[in-house]
UniProtKB/Swiss-Prot annotation:
GO cellular component: cytosol
Protein name from the UniProt record: Alanine racemase
Gene3D superfamilies associated with the record: Alanine racemase (3.20.20.10), Lyase, Ornithine Decarboxylase, Chain A, domain 1 (2.40.37.10)
Keywords associated with the record: Isomerase, Pyridoxal phosphate
Pfam families to which the protein is assigned, alphabetical: Ala_racemase_C, Ala_racemase_N
InterPro entries cross-referenced by the UniProt entry: Ala_racemase, Ala_racemase/Decarboxylase_C, Ala_racemase_C, Ala_racemase_N, PLP-binding_barrel
Length: 374
């Protein structure tokens, strides 16, 4: 009887990548494994996918270092770039690809390149890790997300300066959709047009704008590289499941019934007595709570799966437990498995009941949850 287990199917993960390849057959795949591979496990995900993809994308330098230190020698892109001088030097020494999204990053790169030219044979550089250069730069253009990226009219200036920098090997272009999960969205079409115009004279260079939603719904924007993220894990980037497209859920979150109780009509349940049964019933207590990362704000009626049937959460989720209404005729027993989400209870359904996105559910599981890889 094990509480709070996240079972990760490597087979499902590989299956989903093969499906993505069919959706983008001519493109290279940069698998996004940021945020602990969307909560699925950074290093297990990298090991499972290494022979199927053309590189990995991460958001933090330490993620790139962890993957490379396993012996992986392929492309690793820092999708937010380097945050300071120390990170830039480490990026150079390890040969990571990096995004440039602002003037400050460009100026720091130019400054380090100038120092290298002057001091490359002196002790200044002998005190650093050996530099492997040049590195590949991905110039990020803000086409409408308005989060990171240079303005489209700055592309020529940034390109010229990067082209003249001795620490730059190749220059690619990327952007990010803000509403790609909305089908037939004029704003997304506008972003594509902006990206096209900004990179028109650089069409010989690699380009990328399509992440998960772009892969699914905007094939005209696949360009040379696509960046699958949450869909690798069989999860939709919105509330509509993608299992009908052939994707398989990678994670099953499960736990155990640790108590079964007869409950009288009119009696409250849980902290604050927020739920009161209108009839006699049987309650089950599940070893899963917000201490495991299950949302405390999950409302009454949020579904869980026990013995092949959906039952609702009742009362407030507590730190270590939650309570479900098994029904008066329940035949369930202590020790029975409880599925919080997985193949037969999709995470999109749970997320919609709670009023969050699936991304939050999978990335907020705590270290108390046991991860098993199969």
């Amino acid at each position: 009887m094990k509480p709070a287990i996240a079972t990760i199917s490597r087979q499902a993960l590989r299956h989903n990548i093969q499906l993505i390849k069919k959706l983008a057959p001519k493109q290279k795949l940069l698998a996004m494994i940021k945020a602990n591979a969307y909560g699925q496990g950074l290093l297990p995900a990298a090991a499972t996918l290494a022979d199927l993809v053309d590189g990995f994308g991460v958001a933090r330098l330490h993620e790139a270092l962890e993957v490379q230190e396993t012996g992986y020698t392929g492309k690793i892109l820092l999708v937010e770039g380097f945050f300071d001088r120390e990170e830039l030097l480490k990026t150079l020494s390890r040969g990571f690809d990096t995004v440039i999204h602002c003037l400050e990053q460009l100026e720091l790169l130019e400054q380090v390149a100038k120092e290298w030219q002057i001091e490359q044979q002196k002790r200044f550089w002998q005190r650093k890790t050996k530099i492997y250069f040049p590195i590949n730069i991905w110039l990020k253009i803000d086409t409408g997300m308005h989060r990171l990226g240079i303005h489209p009219e700055q592309v020529d200036l940034f390109y010229a300066r990067l082209k003249s920098c001795p620490l730059v090997a190749t220059i690619s272009f990327m952007s990010h959709f803000s509403r790609a999960d909305e089908l037939d969205c004029g704003y997304t079409e506008q972003q594509i047009a902006t990206f096209e115009m900004a990179t028109e004279q650089y069409s010989a260079h690699s380009r990328s704008i399509a992440a998960s939603s772009g892969i699914l719904y905007w094939p005209q924007a696949h360009y040379e590289w696509v960046r699958p993220g949450i869909i690798m894990h069989g999860i939709s980037p919105h509330y509509q499941p993608i299992t009908q497209l052939g994707f398989k859920p990678v994670m099953t979150l499960s736990s155990t019934l640790i108590a079964i109780r007869s409950h009288k009509a009119g009696e409250p349940v849980g902290y604050g007595g927020a739920w009161i049964s209108d009839k006699a019933t049987t309650l089950g207590v599940v070893a899963m709570g917000y201490g495991d990362g299950y949302p405390r704000n999950a409302p009454e009626g949020t579904p869980v799966l026990i013995n092949g049937r959906i039952v609702p959460i009742v009362g407030r989720v507590s730190m270590d437990m939650l309570t479900v209404d098994l029904g008066i005729d329940s035949q369930d027993q202590v020790g029975d498995e409880v599925i919080l989400w997985g193949n037969d209870l999709l995470i999109e359904t749970v997320a919609q009941h709670i009023g969050v996105i699936s991304y939050e559910l999978i990335t907020k599981l705590t270290p108390r949850v046991i991860f098993e890889y199969r």
